[in-house]
Each structure stands twice: as structure tokens, then as C-alpha cells.
């Protein structure tokens, strides 16, 4: 019997000598300020469609190719198999992704997304687009190069309306298939709004709503207000 572990880890790895870049990235993307530790447990990724809990792995290295050599060893297979995604913060002109990705992606789980977040200010979007075109069909995994420039914010979409920069990374995570994870639909999230309002408070709210309803002269506005209050109070009954 093969155990199916939840693929609920996202690794953020940086080879940049300045740690503030990784810190800023984690805050911007995950609203995470716990950058002094290597594992941040039970984070929440939530959008209008679903909510899921994941663990955030944070690491640094001097050279990503050296790190990859260790990551693709058989000993690291259990770790690779629980990775929802891996985000590499790097200078893509120094990393040379053509040499890096082939060995890396052969070992990575087929459902793991990989994002290379470029921090080289001289790299233009055209160069990023060329790399994405080359690697778009190389593997079944989502592999994407993204420009992320702290000193000059990246434009968040191109002429075709496609998202860029941090917005594109958010989109990749939003559309990720969270393998073996408990993904909570947005409708269920709404149902879990606390319904333990005291009875006295419910009565006071009804009385206040009745007074306001009687003060509204326009019948359409009054009906709209009544419906709104009915929906609001129904969550606590």
C-alpha cells in the first residue's frame, strides 16, 4: 500500500546575498514576517474560490546548482513528494537555468510547480518571455520565470492582459492542484461564520433594523435593506 501524503509544502529558496530581498518577497506574497525560522507551519492560502492550509519552508544557499544536487538525491525523495511548489529567488543570468532545470525537473514531483523569481534589475520582460516559451512544454510541471524587482515594482500585466510579477505567482498558486490536501470551498468557508450570537443581541438587532426600516421612505431601498438584514441575521439563527 502506497501512502498518499498531502502535498502541502511551499519552499522559498534564495541565493541572493542580501537577506532583505527574501524577507520582502515573503511579506509581499505570503504576508509572512517569520523569516528568522526555516519552517512556518499552518499557513493559509485563501482566495474567492477556496482555502487551504500549507507549511512554508524558507531556506538560503550560496549556489542553487549545489543545492539542487543535494535536493535530487534519493534521500530527499520524501521531501520532494510533499512539495506543492518551489520558488527560487535568484539572478537568472547567474543561475543559468538551462543547465539547472533539466536535472532538477527530472527529480521533482510531476505536480510540483516551480517558479524562478528573477531579481536582476537589468533583465527585461522580453527575456523572461523567451525563457517561458522555451520551457513551457519541456515538462508536465508548471515551470515559470517571473520578474520580481523590489526597487521598481513590476507591471502587473502585459498588453494581452496576462499577469506578471507577483500577481502571476499568486495566480500560479491559486490554480495549483493541491494534491491530497483538504481544500475548503469558498461556500463552506461562508457557512463557517460564527453563529453564536447571544439571543439578546439578536433581538436588539431586530429592533434596530425594524426602526431603520420604518424610517426609509423609498420602498425599493426599504425592501433591499430588509433583505440584507434577513441574510445577515440568518447566519446566526
UniProtKB/Swiss-Prot annotation:
**Phenotype upon knockout?**
Displays increased levels of spontaneous RAD52 foci in proliferating diploid cells.
Q: Which domain of life is it from?
A: Eukaryota
Q: Name one GO biological process term.
A: vesicle-mediated transport
Gene3D superfamilies, per database record:
3.40.50.11960
Asked if the record carries the keyword ATP-binding, the reply is: no
- Any GO MF annotation of the entry: protein-macromolecule adaptor activity
Q: Which InterPro entries match?
A: Irc6 (IPR034627)
* Cysteine-cysteine disulfides: none
Q: Which UniProt keywords apply?
A: Chromosomal rearrangement
UniProt cross-references to PANTHER family, sorted A to Z: INCREASED RECOMBINATION CENTERS PROTEIN 6 (PTHR28043:SF1)
The UniProt family comment states: Belongs to the IRC6 family.
UniProt-recorded name of the protein = Increased recombination centers protein 6
User: What gene, per UniProt, encodes this protein?
Assistant: IRC6
